[in-house]
Regions:
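N-terminal Sec-pathway targeting helices
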Residues: 1-13
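N-terminal leader/targeting segments
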Residues: 26-103
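Short beta-strand segments that buttress and anchor functional surface loops
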Residues: 81-89, 112, 160-164
Length: 201
């Protein structure tokens, strides 16, 4: 009897833990820079708030009819979607944003690209944008604390790992410069500041 009681208690605790994990997975976490938009938001609800995108891209991956020999490749749709919006504005900056939706069509993350005209302007705006981002993070209603790591090809960007009250899953925000330089034709050079948002799951 005592053994059965112990098993019952263990099963009950296991179910409670699974319920808490599921709650954490689907608990609303607001995205920084976007009012009324949260992670795990259903696609239909998202469109009502943010509107129709300029472009929708369906993710595809390569599969093989004979996976043992990687022969007869074919493309298949994974179910994930990318919603692209042009003319996104934030604190006087203009750019574009791509939202990523999971196979179940729930919001997974966002990537924002702010173009700049030169590397000098990129450096100037980047450090101002960092200050703006810190202020935005600390203004979150459930903000608790934040740690910072370096990211980017040359460790010239920052990753903010944000702890939120009542949640075990961290909010990660990466802010870093990106560049494409054409040695043959400098007029094709492209400089951006990119901001990624995701939840560590």
């Amino acid at each position: 009897m005592r053994f059965k009681k112990t098993i019952s208690i263990a099963l009950a605790l296991g179910l409670l833990l699974l319920s808490l994990m599921a709650f954490q997975m689907f608990q609303k976490t607001q995205l920084v820079m976007f009012d009324s938009i949260s992670f795990n938001m259903p696609l239909e609800s998202f469109e009502k708030v943010f509107g129709k995108p300029n472009e929708i891209v369906e993710e595809t991956e390569t599969g093989y009819h004979n996976p043992w020999r990687s022969k007869d490749p074919y493309l298949y749709k994974t179910g994930r979607l990318f919603y692209d919006y042009e003319n996104f504005k934030w604190k006087g900056y203009s750019g574009r944003v791509t939202f990523t939706f999971s196979k179940s069509h729930r919001l997974q993350g966002a990537a924002v690209y702010f173009p700049v005209t030169s590397k000098a302007q990129q450096k100037e705006i980047f450090y101002q944008m960092i200050q703006d981002m810190k202020a935005e993070i600390e203004a979150l209603p459930d903000y608790q604390s934040m740690t910072t790591d370096t990211v980017g090809l040359y460790d010239d960007g920052y990753r903010y790992k944000v702890k939120l009250k009542g949640q075990m899953i961290e909010l990660w925000i990466d802010v870093y410069p990106t560049e494409y330089e054409d040695d043959d034709n400098p007029d094709n050079n492209q400089y951006n500041i990119r901001i990624d948002q995701s939840r560590l799951e």
